[in-house]
Amino acid sequence: MLYSLARPMLFSLAPERAHELTLSMLDKAHKLGMMRQTVEAKPTTCMGIEFPNPVGLAAGLDKNGAHIDALAGLGFGFIEIGTITPRPQSGNPKPRLFRIPEAKAIINRMGFNNDGVDKLIENVKASKFRGILGINIGKNADTPVEKAVDDYLICLEKVYNYASYITVNISSPNTKNLRSLQSGDALTELLQTLKARQLELAEQYNHYVPLVLKVAPDLTAEDVEFISAQLLDFKIDGLIVTNTTLSREGVENLPYGNESGGLSGAPVFEKSTECLRLFAQTLKGQIPLIGVGGILSGEQAAAKQQAGATLVQIYSGLIYTGPTLVKQCVEAMT
């Protein structure tokens, strides 16, 4: 109700300014004790972790983990922060975020703007949140792709003791050549190296933190087969399906529809759900799947579950539907 009143004002602002203002308003409401949405318990076990409910916040909304406590008040079963990189970086030039309200869509080319992994850890330590926290890791834009593994290792080692699970993001279209890590020897080397280090860290801390891969929706059936085989070979703990798409289907003739970047929101639902279905058929339940992409209703969250997801995540849907979407999704899922 409150969001439906605030939305016209927020949509009158530049998208990035509205994003900042929304988080600021959430923080203030949380501090005043006004931010507590009651969501039914629906315990879901995934990757050896019991989630209070299967609906999470996707990475990208809180890149630096600076708003965890306020976001927790919306009733999410888990929160994923990031994408974080070893060193701070400003991301791509503005404007880099575009609403397409006619299609309930967003195009972004943010470029992993963040304050760096050390600042994120400071924020996590300052948070009172004791729920399930995913940390999404990436590489710096100026790190050559052939040295990308080094950046992921730095982040993995630093966040390991602060995360419930760690997501390896190799699917953003907004960092040059990043998606090349989804194929061939590059993926093999990345997964092999990170898995070996994960096991060493588990021994060091006497605590196992699951490792999750996040992939793009713009994959062929052959890509799905290859990635699935790699996930099984290296015993990766989970897969997030999917990130944003490079396709412009559904927005090509709309204002901002041809801006470069990743498309999210309603137009990516079918594409990401089909990708999810393909991975589910290939992996046959051996690795749990987290469905994300275009969820704007409880029915769509349930559809992700029917396509093979154990958990779902939302982000763009929150912008168009508001925080009640969390409750709708939890109620619709089994």
From Swiss-Prot:
GO molecular function list: dihydroorotate dehydrogenase (quinone) activity
Any one Pfam family match given in the protein's UniProt record, by short name: DHO_dh
One GO cellular component term: plasma membrane
Catalysed transformations (reactions): (S)-dihydroorotate + a quinone = orotate + a quinol
Main location: membrane
Chain sites annotated for binding substrate: 63, 108-112, 169, 174, 243-244
Residues reported in the UniProt entry to bind FMN: 59-63, 83, 136, 169, 214, 242, 265, 294, 315-316
Pathway in which this enzyme or protein is active: Pyrimidine metabolism; UMP biosynthesis via de novo pathway; orotate from (S)-dihydroorotate (quinone route): step 1/1
Catalytic residue list: 172 (nucleophile)
Gene Ontology BP terms: 'de novo' pyrimidine nucleobase biosynthetic process; 'de novo' UMP biosynthetic process
InterPro entries: Aldolase_TIM (IPR013785), DHO_dehydrogenase (IPR050074), Dihydroorotate_DH_1_2 (IPR012135), Dihydroorotate_DH_2 (IPR005719), Dihydroorotate_DH_cat (IPR005720), Dihydroorotate_DH_CS (IPR001295)
Cellular localization per UniProt: Cell membrane
Keyword Membrane on entry: yes
Superkingdom, natural source: Bacteria
Cofactor(s) this protein requires: FMN
Keyword tags: Cell membrane, Flavoprotein, FMN, Membrane, Oxidoreductase, Pyrimidine biosynthesis
Oligomer status and interactors: Monomer.
Identification of the protein by name: Dihydroorotate dehydrogenase (quinone)
Source organism of this protein record: Acinetobacter baumannii (strain AB307-0294)
Lineage, top ranks: Bacteria, Pseudomonadati, Pseudomonadota, Gammaproteobacteria, Moraxellales
